[in-house]
Amino acid sequence: MNKITHRIATVAPGSIAEELELAPGDVILAINDQEIEDIFDYHYLVEDEYLVMLVEKSDGEQWELEIEKDMDEDLGITFENGLMDDYKSCSNKCIFCFIDQMPPGMRDTLYFKDDDSRLSFLQGNYVTLTNMKEKDIDRIIRYRLDPINISVQTTNPELRCMMLHNRFAGEALKKIDTLYEAGIRMNGQIVLCKGVNDGAELERSIRDLMKYLPYMESVSVVPVGLSKFREGLYPLTPFTKEDACEVLDLIHRWQQVCMQEHGTHFIHASDEWYLLAERELPEEENYDGYIQLENGVGMLRLLKEEFTEALESVPGDPELVREISVATGRLAAPFLQQMLELLTEKYPQICVHVYPIRNDFFGEMITVSGLLTGQDLKKQLSVVPLGEKLLLPCNMVRSEEKDFLDDVTVEELEKTLQVRVDIVKSSGTDLLDAIIK
Protein backbone atom coordinates (compact mmCIF):
# COMPACT_ATOMS: atom_id res chain seq x y z
CA MET A 1 0.00 0.00 0.00
CA ASN A 2 1.23 3.46 -0.91
CA LYS A 3 0.56 5.63 2.14
CA ILE A 4 0.77 8.80 0.07
CA THR A 5 -2.31 7.82 -1.93
CA HIS A 6 -4.29 7.10 1.27
CA ARG A 7 -3.54 10.42 2.97
CA ILE A 8 -6.55 12.53 3.98
CA ALA A 9 -6.84 15.90 2.26
CA THR A 10 -9.98 17.35 3.87
CA VAL A 11 -12.39 16.57 6.69
CA ALA A 12 -15.91 17.96 6.35
CA PRO A 13 -17.16 20.14 9.25
CA GLY A 14 -19.70 18.31 11.41
CA SER A 15 -18.86 14.95 9.84
CA ILE A 16 -18.17 11.61 11.53
CA ALA A 17 -14.50 12.05 10.64
CA GLU A 18 -14.36 15.37 12.49
CA GLU A 19 -16.01 13.80 15.56
CA LEU A 20 -13.30 11.12 15.49
CA GLU A 21 -10.64 13.87 15.39
CA LEU A 22 -9.32 12.77 12.02
CA ALA A 23 -7.34 15.49 10.27
CA PRO A 24 -5.65 16.28 6.96
CA GLY A 25 -2.38 14.36 6.78
CA ASP A 26 -3.73 11.27 8.55
CA VAL A 27 -3.49 8.01 6.60
CA ILE A 28 -6.20 5.33 6.39
CA LEU A 29 -4.40 1.98 6.69
CA ALA A 30 -7.29 -0.51 6.80
CA ILE A 31 -11.03 -0.89 7.34
CA ASN A 32 -12.38 -4.03 9.03
CA ASP A 33 -8.92 -5.63 8.75
CA GLN A 34 -8.90 -5.16 4.98
CA GLU A 35 -6.30 -3.09 3.19
CA ILE A 36 -7.70 -0.54 0.76
CA GLU A 37 -6.52 -0.76 -2.83
CA ASP A 38 -8.30 2.33 -4.14
CA ILE A 39 -11.29 4.64 -3.72
CA PHE A 40 -13.74 1.90 -4.76
CA ASP A 41 -12.59 -0.39 -1.96
CA TYR A 42 -12.91 2.54 0.44
CA HIS A 43 -16.50 3.37 -0.56
CA TYR A 44 -17.48 -0.30 -0.54
CA LEU A 45 -16.06 -0.89 2.94
CA VAL A 46 -17.44 2.26 4.60
CA GLU A 47 -21.01 1.43 3.58
CA ASP A 48 -21.35 -0.88 6.61
CA GLU A 49 -22.96 0.25 9.86
CA TYR A 50 -20.08 -1.00 12.02
CA LEU A 51 -16.48 -0.24 11.12
CA VAL A 52 -13.09 -0.73 12.69
CA MET A 53 -10.69 1.70 11.04
CA LEU A 54 -6.92 1.66 11.45
CA VAL A 55 -5.47 5.15 11.06
CA GLU A 56 -1.92 6.45 11.17
CA LYS A 57 -1.79 10.00 12.52
CA SER A 58 0.56 12.56 11.06
CA ASP A 59 2.95 12.04 14.01
CA GLY A 60 3.19 8.29 13.27
CA GLU A 61 0.89 7.12 16.08
CA GLN A 62 -1.68 4.48 15.04
CA TRP A 63 -5.31 4.67 16.17
CA GLU A 64 -7.90 1.91 15.98
CA LEU A 65 -11.31 3.55 15.72
CA GLU A 66 -14.63 1.76 16.24
CA ILE A 67 -17.40 3.45 14.29
CA GLU A 68 -21.15 2.93 14.46
CA LYS A 69 -23.16 4.82 11.87
CA ASP A 70 -26.12 4.61 9.51
CA MET A 71 -25.79 2.33 6.50
CA ASP A 72 -24.32 4.26 3.51
CA GLU A 73 -23.57 7.30 5.72
CA ASP A 74 -20.41 9.02 4.51
CA LEU A 75 -17.48 9.69 6.84
CA GLY A 76 -16.79 13.12 5.36
CA ILE A 77 -13.28 12.49 4.06
CA THR A 78 -11.54 13.36 0.81
CA PHE A 79 -8.07 12.15 -0.14
CA GLU A 80 -5.03 13.86 -1.62
CA ASN A 81 -5.13 11.31 -4.42
CA GLY A 82 -8.73 11.05 -5.62
CA LEU A 83 -8.17 7.49 -6.84
CA MET A 84 -6.30 6.43 -3.67
CA ASP A 85 -3.89 4.57 -5.93
CA ASP A 86 -1.32 5.18 -8.64
CA TYR A 87 -2.78 5.62 -12.11
CA LYS A 88 -2.23 2.77 -14.56
CA SER A 89 -0.31 3.87 -17.62
CA CYS A 90 -0.81 2.72 -21.18
CA SER A 91 1.33 -0.16 -22.44
CA ASN A 92 0.43 0.34 -26.11
CA LYS A 93 2.13 2.25 -28.89
CA CYS A 94 -0.92 3.21 -30.93
CA ILE A 95 -0.31 4.47 -34.45
CA PHE A 96 -2.75 7.34 -33.84
CA CYS A 97 -1.69 8.36 -30.30
CA PHE A 98 -1.68 12.15 -30.01
CA ILE A 99 0.71 12.17 -27.05
CA ASP A 100 3.39 10.71 -29.34
CA GLN A 101 2.77 13.67 -31.65
CA MET A 102 3.54 16.39 -29.12
CA PRO A 103 6.74 18.43 -29.13
CA PRO A 104 9.24 18.24 -26.26
CA GLY A 105 9.26 20.83 -23.51
CA MET A 106 5.59 20.80 -22.51
CA ARG A 107 4.45 20.14 -18.94
CA ASP A 108 5.03 16.59 -17.73
CA THR A 109 1.37 15.73 -17.13
CA LEU A 110 0.63 16.10 -20.85
CA TYR A 111 2.93 13.18 -21.65
CA PHE A 112 1.27 10.70 -19.27
CA LYS A 113 -0.75 8.04 -21.10
CA ASP A 114 -3.41 6.62 -18.81
CA ASP A 115 -5.20 3.36 -19.54
CA ASP A 116 -7.02 2.85 -16.25
CA SER A 117 -10.51 1.33 -16.15
CA ARG A 118 -11.20 3.13 -12.86
CA LEU A 119 -10.72 6.48 -14.60
CA SER A 120 -13.16 5.27 -17.23
CA PHE A 121 -15.81 5.08 -14.52
CA LEU A 122 -14.75 8.21 -12.61
CA GLN A 123 -13.87 10.58 -15.45
CA GLY A 124 -15.23 8.99 -18.62
CA ASN A 125 -11.77 8.14 -19.99
CA TYR A 126 -11.52 5.48 -22.71
CA VAL A 127 -9.48 2.33 -22.07
CA THR A 128 -8.05 -0.25 -24.46
CA LEU A 129 -8.48 -3.27 -22.09
CA THR A 130 -4.92 -4.41 -22.83
CA ASN A 131 -3.62 -3.93 -19.28
CA MET A 132 -6.85 -4.97 -17.57
CA LYS A 133 -6.28 -8.12 -15.53
CA GLU A 134 -8.87 -10.69 -14.46
CA LYS A 135 -9.06 -9.18 -10.97
CA ASP A 136 -9.81 -5.78 -12.55
CA ILE A 137 -12.71 -7.31 -14.47
CA ASP A 138 -13.95 -9.00 -11.29
CA ARG A 139 -13.90 -5.70 -9.39
CA ILE A 140 -15.77 -3.89 -12.19
CA ILE A 141 -18.47 -6.54 -12.01
CA ARG A 142 -18.56 -6.71 -8.20
CA TYR A 143 -18.73 -2.94 -7.71
CA ARG A 144 -20.85 -2.36 -10.86
CA LEU A 145 -18.39 0.23 -12.13
CA ASP A 146 -20.25 1.17 -15.26
CA PRO A 147 -20.38 2.50 -17.85
CA ILE A 148 -16.94 1.44 -18.98
CA ASN A 149 -15.72 3.36 -22.03
CA ILE A 150 -13.68 1.24 -24.42
CA SER A 151 -11.25 2.32 -27.15
CA VAL A 152 -12.16 -0.37 -29.63
CA GLN A 153 -10.61 0.99 -32.88
CA THR A 154 -11.44 -2.27 -34.69
CA THR A 155 -12.89 -5.69 -33.92
CA ASN A 156 -10.41 -7.35 -36.27
CA PRO A 157 -7.94 -8.93 -33.78
CA GLU A 158 -4.93 -8.87 -36.12
CA LEU A 159 -5.58 -5.29 -37.20
CA ARG A 160 -6.05 -4.20 -33.59
CA CYS A 161 -2.68 -5.70 -32.66
CA MET A 162 -1.11 -3.67 -35.47
CA MET A 163 -2.91 -0.42 -34.61
CA LEU A 164 -2.10 -0.62 -30.90
CA HIS A 165 1.35 -2.13 -31.53
CA ASN A 166 0.54 -4.71 -28.87
CA ARG A 167 0.41 -8.44 -29.61
CA PHE A 168 -2.22 -8.91 -26.89
CA ALA A 169 -4.60 -6.23 -28.20
CA GLY A 170 -6.72 -8.64 -30.24
CA GLU A 171 -7.09 -11.11 -27.38
CA ALA A 172 -8.15 -8.23 -25.10
CA LEU A 173 -11.37 -7.84 -27.10
CA LYS A 174 -12.67 -11.00 -25.39
CA LYS A 175 -13.01 -8.94 -22.20
CA ILE A 176 -15.94 -7.18 -23.85
CA ASP A 177 -17.72 -10.55 -23.88
CA THR A 178 -17.15 -10.94 -20.13
CA LEU A 179 -18.46 -7.44 -19.40
CA TYR A 180 -21.46 -8.02 -21.66
CA GLU A 181 -22.34 -11.33 -19.99
CA ALA A 182 -22.20 -9.59 -16.59
CA GLY A 183 -24.56 -6.85 -17.76
CA ILE A 184 -21.97 -4.07 -17.48
CA ARG A 185 -22.90 -1.01 -19.52
CA MET A 186 -20.30 0.07 -22.08
CA ASN A 187 -19.61 2.73 -24.69
CA GLY A 188 -17.18 2.32 -27.55
CA GLN A 189 -14.91 4.59 -29.54
CA ILE A 190 -13.29 4.10 -32.92
CA VAL A 191 -10.48 6.47 -33.88
CA LEU A 192 -10.68 6.23 -37.65
CA CYS A 193 -7.42 6.16 -39.60
CA LYS A 194 -7.56 6.55 -43.36
CA GLY A 195 -6.79 3.33 -45.21
CA VAL A 196 -6.43 1.36 -41.97
CA ASN A 197 -9.68 0.73 -40.09
CA ASP A 198 -12.16 2.56 -42.32
CA GLY A 199 -14.32 1.24 -45.16
CA ALA A 200 -14.97 -2.51 -44.93
CA GLU A 201 -13.10 -2.74 -41.62
CA LEU A 202 -15.38 -0.09 -40.10
CA GLU A 203 -18.43 -1.99 -41.32
CA ARG A 204 -17.08 -5.15 -39.73
CA SER A 205 -16.52 -3.35 -36.43
CA ILE A 206 -20.02 -1.88 -36.38
CA ARG A 207 -21.58 -5.25 -37.19
CA ASP A 208 -19.57 -7.01 -34.49
CA LEU A 209 -20.26 -4.38 -31.81
CA MET A 210 -24.00 -4.46 -32.46
CA LYS A 211 -23.99 -7.95 -30.92
CA TYR A 212 -23.33 -6.34 -27.54
CA LEU A 213 -26.51 -4.26 -27.54
CA PRO A 214 -28.14 -3.23 -25.24
CA TYR A 215 -25.19 -3.23 -22.82
CA MET A 216 -22.90 -1.63 -25.39
CA GLU A 217 -24.99 1.53 -25.47
CA SER A 218 -23.21 3.53 -28.15
CA VAL A 219 -20.13 3.72 -30.36
CA SER A 220 -18.56 6.93 -31.65
CA VAL A 221 -16.39 7.32 -34.73
CA VAL A 222 -13.87 10.16 -34.55
CA PRO A 223 -11.21 11.15 -37.10
CA VAL A 224 -7.56 10.74 -36.15
CA GLY A 225 -5.83 13.95 -35.11
CA LEU A 226 -2.54 14.54 -36.91
CA SER A 227 0.00 17.08 -35.69
CA LYS A 228 3.12 18.25 -37.53
CA PHE A 229 5.32 16.29 -35.12
CA ARG A 230 5.01 12.85 -36.74
CA GLU A 231 8.58 12.14 -37.80
CA GLY A 232 9.32 8.44 -37.34
CA LEU A 233 5.66 7.58 -36.68
CA TYR A 234 3.29 5.44 -38.75
CA PRO A 235 2.44 7.27 -42.01
CA LEU A 236 -1.14 8.49 -41.65
CA THR A 237 -2.91 10.95 -43.94
CA PRO A 238 -5.78 13.33 -43.14
CA PHE A 239 -9.33 12.72 -44.31
CA THR A 240 -10.68 14.87 -47.16
CA LYS A 241 -14.17 16.24 -47.69
CA GLU A 242 -14.94 13.30 -49.99
CA ASP A 243 -13.68 10.83 -47.39
CA ALA A 244 -15.88 12.44 -44.74
CA CYS A 245 -18.93 12.10 -46.98
CA GLU A 246 -18.22 8.39 -47.45
CA VAL A 247 -17.79 7.85 -43.71
CA LEU A 248 -21.07 9.63 -42.97
CA ASP A 249 -22.94 7.68 -45.64
CA LEU A 250 -21.68 4.41 -44.13
CA ILE A 251 -22.58 5.43 -40.59
CA HIS A 252 -26.03 6.66 -41.61
CA ARG A 253 -26.75 3.32 -43.31
CA TRP A 254 -25.90 1.45 -40.14
CA GLN A 255 -27.89 3.89 -38.02
CA GLN A 256 -30.97 2.95 -40.02
CA VAL A 257 -30.28 -0.75 -39.42
CA CYS A 258 -29.78 -0.17 -35.69
CA MET A 259 -32.97 1.87 -35.41
CA GLN A 260 -35.00 -0.80 -37.18
CA GLU A 261 -33.58 -3.69 -35.17
CA HIS A 262 -32.86 -2.12 -31.77
CA GLY A 263 -34.60 1.26 -31.57
CA THR A 264 -31.33 3.19 -31.14
CA HIS A 265 -28.91 4.89 -33.54
CA PHE A 266 -26.01 3.23 -31.67
CA ILE A 267 -23.20 4.28 -34.04
CA HIS A 268 -22.43 8.01 -34.11
CA ALA A 269 -20.17 10.28 -36.13
CA SER A 270 -18.43 13.09 -34.27
CA ASP A 271 -19.20 16.68 -35.28
CA GLU A 272 -15.89 16.98 -37.15
CA TRP A 273 -17.14 14.66 -39.91
CA TYR A 274 -20.14 16.89 -40.65
CA LEU A 275 -18.04 20.06 -40.64
CA LEU A 276 -15.41 18.48 -42.89
CA ALA A 277 -18.09 17.15 -45.26
CA GLU A 278 -19.88 20.53 -45.15
CA ARG A 279 -23.14 18.80 -44.26
CA GLU A 280 -25.89 19.84 -41.88
CA LEU A 281 -25.73 18.39 -38.39
CA PRO A 282 -28.35 15.74 -37.54
CA GLU A 283 -31.42 16.75 -35.55
CA GLU A 284 -31.33 16.45 -31.78
CA GLU A 285 -33.23 13.14 -31.63
CA ASN A 286 -30.50 11.44 -33.67
CA TYR A 287 -28.04 11.70 -30.78
CA ASP A 288 -29.85 9.30 -28.42
CA GLY A 289 -29.70 11.72 -25.50
CA TYR A 290 -26.17 12.96 -26.32
CA ILE A 291 -24.63 9.81 -24.88
CA GLN A 292 -21.28 10.45 -26.63
CA LEU A 293 -21.04 14.19 -25.98
CA GLU A 294 -17.52 14.01 -24.50
CA ASN A 295 -16.30 12.56 -27.80
CA GLY A 296 -17.60 15.56 -29.70
CA VAL A 297 -20.75 13.78 -30.85
CA GLY A 298 -23.59 16.31 -30.90
CA MET A 299 -21.69 19.03 -29.08
CA LEU A 300 -22.47 21.65 -31.73
CA ARG A 301 -26.10 20.57 -32.09
CA LEU A 302 -26.58 20.86 -28.33
CA LEU A 303 -24.84 24.25 -28.30
CA LYS A 304 -27.18 25.56 -30.99
CA GLU A 305 -30.30 24.12 -29.34
CA GLU A 306 -29.36 25.68 -25.99
CA PHE A 307 -28.39 29.00 -27.58
CA THR A 308 -31.63 29.20 -29.58
CA GLU A 309 -33.77 28.29 -26.57
CA ALA A 310 -31.99 30.84 -24.38
CA LEU A 311 -32.35 33.51 -27.06
CA GLU A 312 -36.08 32.85 -27.35
CA SER A 313 -36.48 33.33 -23.59
CA VAL A 314 -35.02 36.86 -23.45
CA PRO A 315 -36.89 40.01 -24.54
CA GLY A 316 -34.01 41.44 -26.53
CA ASP A 317 -32.68 44.99 -26.49
CA PRO A 318 -32.42 46.96 -29.74
CA GLU A 319 -30.56 49.73 -27.86
CA LEU A 320 -27.76 47.50 -26.52
CA VAL A 321 -24.56 48.46 -28.32
CA ARG A 322 -21.68 46.04 -27.93
CA GLU A 323 -18.63 44.81 -29.84
CA ILE A 324 -17.00 41.58 -28.69
CA SER A 325 -14.95 38.75 -30.14
CA VAL A 326 -14.99 34.97 -30.08
CA ALA A 327 -11.96 32.85 -30.97
CA THR A 328 -12.29 29.19 -31.86
CA GLY A 329 -10.78 26.45 -34.01
CA ARG A 330 -10.89 26.76 -37.78
CA LEU A 331 -13.23 23.82 -38.25
CA ALA A 332 -16.13 25.09 -36.12
CA ALA A 333 -15.76 28.81 -36.87
CA PRO A 334 -18.21 28.93 -39.83
CA PHE A 335 -20.84 27.08 -37.80
CA LEU A 336 -20.38 29.44 -34.87
CA GLN A 337 -20.54 32.50 -37.14
CA GLN A 338 -23.82 31.30 -38.63
CA MET A 339 -25.29 30.54 -35.20
CA LEU A 340 -24.39 33.95 -33.78
CA GLU A 341 -26.19 35.66 -36.66
CA LEU A 342 -29.39 34.63 -34.85
CA LEU A 343 -28.67 37.51 -32.46
CA THR A 344 -29.44 40.13 -35.09
CA GLU A 345 -33.22 40.20 -34.73
CA LYS A 346 -33.26 40.83 -30.97
CA TYR A 347 -29.89 42.56 -30.60
CA PRO A 348 -29.26 44.42 -33.88
CA GLN A 349 -26.47 46.57 -32.42
CA ILE A 350 -24.35 43.75 -31.02
CA CYS A 351 -21.34 43.00 -33.21
CA VAL A 352 -19.61 39.66 -32.62
CA HIS A 353 -16.36 38.96 -34.44
CA VAL A 354 -15.69 35.24 -34.87
CA TYR A 355 -12.00 34.54 -35.40
CA PRO A 356 -10.85 31.10 -36.63
CA ILE A 357 -7.42 30.47 -35.13
CA ARG A 358 -4.85 28.63 -37.20
CA ASN A 359 -2.94 26.07 -35.17
CA ASP A 360 0.69 26.95 -35.84
CA PHE A 361 1.84 25.17 -32.67
CA PHE A 362 0.65 21.65 -33.55
CA GLY A 363 0.19 22.22 -37.27
CA GLU A 364 -2.62 23.29 -39.57
CA MET A 365 -4.17 19.81 -39.71
CA ILE A 366 -5.28 20.34 -36.09
CA THR A 367 -8.44 22.42 -36.39
CA VAL A 368 -10.28 21.96 -33.06
CA SER A 369 -10.42 24.61 -30.32
CA GLY A 370 -9.29 22.31 -27.50
CA LEU A 371 -5.75 22.07 -28.92
CA LEU A 372 -5.13 25.78 -29.45
CA THR A 373 -2.33 27.44 -27.52
CA GLY A 374 -1.88 30.81 -25.89
CA GLN A 375 0.95 31.78 -28.22
CA ASP A 376 -1.20 31.25 -31.32
CA LEU A 377 -3.99 33.30 -29.77
CA LYS A 378 -1.55 36.09 -28.91
CA LYS A 379 -0.05 36.25 -32.38
CA GLN A 380 -3.20 36.05 -34.46
CA LEU A 381 -5.53 38.15 -32.30
CA SER A 382 -3.08 41.01 -31.78
CA VAL A 383 -3.74 42.33 -35.29
CA VAL A 384 -7.56 42.26 -35.34
CA PRO A 385 -10.27 44.34 -33.61
CA LEU A 386 -11.46 42.63 -30.43
CA GLY A 387 -13.97 45.08 -28.98
CA GLU A 388 -14.63 45.22 -25.26
CA LYS A 389 -13.93 41.56 -24.47
CA LEU A 390 -12.76 38.26 -25.94
CA LEU A 391 -14.69 35.03 -25.35
CA LEU A 392 -12.88 31.69 -25.38
CA PRO A 393 -14.38 28.19 -24.97
CA CYS A 394 -13.52 26.49 -21.69
CA ASN A 395 -11.87 23.52 -23.41
CA MET A 396 -8.90 25.74 -24.29
CA VAL A 397 -7.74 26.02 -20.67
CA ARG A 398 -7.28 23.93 -17.56
CA SER A 399 -10.27 24.80 -15.41
CA GLU A 400 -8.47 25.58 -12.17
CA GLU A 401 -5.13 26.95 -13.33
CA LYS A 402 -6.56 29.04 -16.20
CA ASP A 403 -3.62 28.32 -18.49
CA PHE A 404 -3.35 26.99 -22.03
CA LEU A 405 -1.51 23.89 -23.27
CA ASP A 406 1.70 25.89 -23.68
CA ASP A 407 1.41 27.28 -20.12
CA VAL A 408 0.52 30.79 -21.28
CA THR A 409 -2.00 32.08 -18.74
CA VAL A 410 -5.27 33.87 -19.38
CA GLU A 411 -3.83 36.83 -17.49
CA GLU A 412 -0.82 36.95 -19.84
CA LEU A 413 -3.15 36.85 -22.84
CA GLU A 414 -5.18 39.75 -21.44
CA LYS A 415 -2.03 41.84 -20.94
CA THR A 416 -0.76 41.13 -24.45
CA LEU A 417 -4.07 41.83 -26.19
CA GLN A 418 -5.12 44.61 -23.82
CA VAL A 419 -8.63 43.20 -23.59
CA ARG A 420 -10.70 41.36 -21.02
CA VAL A 421 -10.79 37.61 -21.65
CA ASP A 422 -13.78 35.56 -20.47
CA ILE A 423 -13.67 31.76 -20.43
CA VAL A 424 -17.13 30.51 -21.40
CA LYS A 425 -18.62 27.18 -20.34
CA SER A 426 -19.70 24.82 -23.10
CA SER A 427 -23.46 25.49 -22.94
CA GLY A 428 -25.32 27.76 -25.36
CA THR A 429 -26.98 29.51 -22.42
CA ASP A 430 -23.59 30.48 -20.99
CA LEU A 431 -22.47 31.75 -24.39
CA LEU A 432 -25.52 33.99 -24.74
CA ASP A 433 -25.09 35.31 -21.21
CA ALA A 434 -21.44 36.13 -21.92
CA ILE A 435 -22.50 38.14 -24.97
CA ILE A 436 -25.45 40.14 -23.63
CA LYS A 437 -24.59 40.56 -19.92
What are the functions of these language-model segments?
Residues 7, 278-437:
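Radical SAM enzyme core and accessory elements
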Residues 147-149, 185-187, 218-220, 266-268, ...:
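Structural preference for beta-strand elements that scaffold enzyme active sites
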Residues 1-12:
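PDZ/PDZ-like groove recognition
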Residues 17, 25-28, 42, 53, ...:
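Terminal peptide-recognition signature
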Residues 19-37:
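Conserved PDZ fold ligand-binding element
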Residues 60-62, 69-215, 225-254:
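Conserved Radical SAM active-site core
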Residues 35-42, 61-64:
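Short, Lys/Arg- and Gly-enriched loop/turn segments at beta-strand edges
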